[in-house]
Structure formats: C-alpha cells, structure tokens
A protein has these predicted regions:
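Conserved active-site carboxylates
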Residues: 144, 166-167
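N-terminal structural segment of carbohydrate-active enzymes
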Residues: 1-57, 84, 89-91
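Aromatic-lined carbohydrate-binding/catalytic grooves of carbohydrate-active enzymes
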Residues: 40-76, 101-117, 126-127, 170-180
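Active-site-adjacent "subsite" loops/lids of carbohydrate-active enzymes
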Residues: 95, 99-156, 195, 200-203
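Aromatic-lined carbohydrate-recognition surfaces of secreted/lumenal glycan-active proteins
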Residues: 87, 91-104, 162-166, 192-213
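Proline-aspartate-enriched helix->loop->beta-strand connector
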Residues: 44, 157-161
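The substrate-binding groove and active-site-proximal loops of carbohydrate-active enzymes
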Residues: 14-30, 60-77, 126-146, 186-201, ...
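Conserved, mostly hydrophobic/aromatic
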Residues: 39, 86, 93, 145, ...
Length: 213
C-alpha cells in the first residue's frame, strides 16, 4: 500500500470480532473482494481488523502459535485477505491485538493472572461467563504478547496496531512482589503497588511500539 499519504483518517470502522470457540464455520463464506468493495462504496478509508481477540484466538495463519488459531477458522488467511483487498482500494487496515484479556491464556496459565491484595485472581470468577480475567504484564505473559506482535508485523502488511485493554492494575502476584522488593518498594503498600503497576505497564508497551517504529 502507498504509505505516502499521511494523516489520521476519519471514515474509520472498528470491526469488533471477539469470536467464541463455540462458533463454527468462521469465515467459511468470506469473500475478500466483496468485503472491501462494500467498504469502498461506503467511503470507508480505514478499518480495524483482528489478529487476536479477547477469547485468545488468532485470525491469521500463525506459524509460531498454530494452537491459538481459532479452532473453527475456515479460512486461515482471513486477516491477510482483508488487508490485501482493502489495500487495493487505498483503505488502511490497522490490526487489533488484545493485551490484558485473553481467555485461552488465562485458563491455561492462571499463574500469569493479576492477584488482588487479598489473594484472589482479578477478574471473572471461574464459573461465570465472560473473558474478563486480568493478565499480569510482569509475568512471562509479556513475552507472549511481544512474540505475537512481532509475528503479525513480520508476516502481514499492517497499517498500524490497536492494543486494547492496556490498564494500570495493582497486582500482588509473585512476579510483582519480587520486582517491588528488588526496587525497595513495599508490596503491602497500595501506593507502591500502583507505582509499580505503572512501570509494569509502560515498559512493555513502549517496547511494542518501538517494534513498529
């Protein structure tokens, strides 16, 4: 795509696409040409499409994380085709990547979840519906987000990144407690937990954006 045209585009759509594994036939009838043509007719000039949703599923043909591709994604080139056909019509496609909500990871790695001061996991309880379990960016989960982001940038012609759910959350997990102690902070002090949470959030986000620049 010609990247010489600068400036923020305002005919923008956010195509929310959080898709449960219980849904089958995802993108089975997707027609990239029709998709982009409809956007062009509506004079859309930018649309956010999904690489990764809150359920933790991927919508591109990941080689690094094939187990995370949506189990019922009929067209593994969904995101690639969305981008390419939009580009043919001069439509930009920034790509969505969830950060602190990822149900797939939360279920398989509870040790990466944010822990509250009273020792509970932060977010949706185990037997309630929803994917709002908060993952801690001071855990090894940080590297996972980085690797997924790197793969998206390396394999797809994206026009930008939309990192969602990037929120300061005080945490008392072992990773945060150890980190606070190393900096001379008091993990039992809420103000110290909040200060450390800001650091925990800023460091990886700056690094991810540096990958784009």
């Amino acid at each position: 795509m010609d990247q010489t045209e600068q400036g923020l585009r305002f005919r923008q759509i956010h195509l929310d696409f959080h898709t449960s594994e219980a849904i089958t036939g995802v993108a089975a009838k997707f027609d990239a040409e029709e998709f982009a043509s409809v956007l062009e007719q509506a004079r859309v000039n930018s649309i956010t499409c999904f690489a990764r949703c809150h359920h933790g599923w991927l919508y591109y043909d990941s080689k690094k994380f094939p187990e995370r591709i949506h189990p019922h994604l009929a067209n593994r080139n969904l995101l690639k085709e969305q981008i390419e056909d939009c580009h043919r019509r001069k439509i930009r496609v920034p790509v969505y990547i969830t950060v602190q909500w990822d149900h797939y990871t939360a279920v398989r790695h509870p040790e990466w979840l944010v822990v509250t001061a009273d020792g509970r996991f932060s977010g949706t309880p185990p037997f309630e519906s929803g994917f709002y379990r908060n993952l801690c960016l001071n855990s090894p989960y940080r590297e996972l987000v980085k690797e997924i982001t790197a793969e998206v940038l390396e394999t797809l012609p994206v026009d930008g990144l939309f990192f969602d759910i990037v929120i300061v959350r005080e945490c008392a997990c072992r990773h945060c407690i150890d980190g606070m102690k190393r900096q001379g902070m008091d993990p039992a002090d809420r103000e110290d937990r909040l200060r450390y949470a800001v650091q925990t959030l800023n460091q990886p986000v700056v690094g991810w954006f540096a990958m784009v620049i």
